[in-house]
Amino acid sequence: MTKKRTVKRKVKEPEPTKEQPSVSEQSENEEDEDLLQAVKDPGEDTTDDEGIDQEYQSDSSEDLEFESDEEGNYLGRKVSNEAEEGEDDQDEDDDEDEDEGEDEDDDSDDDSEESDANEASATPKDDQPSSSKAAAAQTKEPIIQIIPRDPSKPEYEESDTSDEEDIRNTVGNIPMHWYDEYKHIGYDWDAKKIIKPPKGDQIDDFLRKIEDPNFWRTVKDPMTGQEVLLTDEDIALIKRVNSSRIPNPEHDEYAPWIEWFTSEVEKMPIKNVPDHKRSFLPSVSEKKKVSRMVHALKMGWMKTTEEVEREKQQKRGPKFYMLWETDTGREHMRRIHDPVSAPKRDLPGHAESYNPPPEYLFDEKETKEWLKLKDEPHKRKLHFMPQKYKSLRAVPAYSRYLRERFLRCLDLYLCPRAKRVKLNIDAEYLIPKLPSPRDLQPFPTVESLVYRGHTDLVRSVSVEPKGEYLVSGSDDKTVKIWEIATGRCIRTIETNDVVRCVAWCPNAKLSIIAVATGSRLLLINPKVGDKLLIKKTDDLLAESPNLDIIESERIKTAVQWSNAEPDEQEKGVRVVITHFKPIRQVTWHGRGDYLATVMPEGANRSALIHQLSKRRSQIPFSKSKGLIQCVLFHPVKPCFFVATQHNIRIYDLVKQELIKKLLTNSKWISGMSIHPKGDNLLVSTYDKKMLWFDLDLSTKPYQTMRLHRNAVRSVAFHLRYPLFASGSDDQAVIVSHGMVYNDLLQNPLIVPLKKLQTHEKRDEFGVLDVTWHPVQPWVFSTGADCTIRLYT
């Protein structure tokens, strides 16, 4: 059963004018159209109650009637030409319905016909603006007056909904800049795009700023892109927050204090029970106990404290001290008669002040060094980092207080105290007397040439036996041959992979370069120098010897010999030795017929020895005793040096047995070099150390040198002069004097001479390789800055 409720509005037709409608009138027309559309389509969700009470414009004076059911849902409207006749007819119809009790079906049919007629006649015209005022008719049926919502109150304050805000854009809590590239800003409840409002230029903003009095209180809603006008309450709230006051003006900051719990301590008994009668009588049990004690005293069973102490002294007997006693006894007596007081703590210095002078504060370099010694705090100069505060009030609590108190207690409790005679020793007496560097010349002191041409890290460098040419390998997959005297690049050979190591054959009668690129070892004829020597080298590498020896499958799967392809033959490549794993290092024997390669990932086949004249290879080890880093041939004896991560093993190739194992006590070995006489070995490590081993003296280092600040990557001995050099990631090449005497009773003389630091650091890498000129006291270094530098 539906009831008809009417809201009637009288509309007067305005006088026609030739002026264009203003912006406010156009907005009213748009609102009227929305209102009429909402009334016309009752199926749509219309939640804006405000629009019903707004004035709308029409071209005729008509009355609107809204129909609603018992729940208040609007079903339609109807329009009559004359307001009074429509009201009377409506009243009569309602009276007849109530008195006669007609069927509900007839009423619903009449209502539907009237609503259809109203829909057909209530279409407004857009081209004629008009204004109207709403007036409710005095009829018998109840008329519902639509009260506009107070904008100062929340939208759902008086309703039973749980929503707290009017959400127009349903995209959720996401960054709105995601919609910067689109024409819409989100989607409404009907899944329709919300088109962005048109944006004006700076002139429009300037005109609005001048003409619009509410421009200063207009903000933009980021969710819908619409402009929102702040109310007076919002402005007042912003002002209170900006002035650091409580946002709610009704809140009283200084309300009278209500003392819910009293501050006065009231002492009251837990139980207020009157004392029992027996509490005033003497205790019977105590009386019996006292009587037993009196009986024990009379019988002599119980003794007083003085009698007990006298009996203890009689049992202990007299004390006698021995004249000749052990040291422990004397120390015990000394602690009794001549105690040593605990040492006092050191007084705080200027660095421990809360406002120390600037020279006591750490700079960036000192701070990094202090933090690096986290695992070794005993090496720090100060156990704390000096801090500066503006005032004593800003000084926080000392975090190490409890630990220092605990350590102090341990020192007092556990550390023995003794008086020792201090020895006055001159410090200069302990320093070994070293010769002056001027007396140890010649050695390189300045940078003479820079060889530029590579575009990536230069990994390795090697010099021709005569000292005229230089070969280098880089990560840019090229091998370059240089003329040392002029710095000119003579030839560039491109490879298919990164060049890890290059080595020039030490035999002056051959012109061969061994290049380790990827898993291939290339034997290249550089075609520089004597033409007869070049031809002899080509003839040697072109001949393929007859292999009468049958190789095992273990060797065949590890390495294969082959001649170079025609395109590689043009570059100078003659022989290709293909390995099953990437090659890291290649080294030659002193005679130039044997060369060894290292593959760290090869397990028990990491080290291979190749013979050039017979074109065959052999695997010297059947078991892997560590990750092999580098290998080396002895210059005189048939010995083979193998360096793993932590140790160095020396093998006799003739007897095929282990001769000696050198203990480095380091974390990771990076390289090694042997003295030309073969009795001393120099080892570089990644933990900033250089180790000098005397092979005739011991298996432990004769001297450990910590000359670099970062990892030491390469070391090299000079073939003629008593010099050796080291290169590190700290961009420095340190040249040192290392004299080895023929007298076995005299120790080697080691003197650091010069620090050459001209390389640039890139990606935490500095100097990657160093090598000496075979004749002159010149040293070459390669670095991560894609250059090769010559120091003379």
UniProtKB/Swiss-Prot annotation:
This is Ribosome biogenesis protein BOP1 homolog. Keywords: Nucleus, Repeat, Ribosome biogenesis, rRNA processing, WD repeat. Required for maturation of ribosomal RNAs and formation of the large ribosomal subunit. HAMAP family: BOP1. One of its GO terms (biological process) is maturation of LSU-rRNA from tricistronic rRNA transcript (SSU-rRNA, 5.8S rRNA, LSU-rRNA). Transmembrane segments: none annotated. One of its GO terms (cellular component) is preribosome, large subunit precursor. It is found in: Nucleus, Nucleolus; Nucleus, Nucleoplasm.
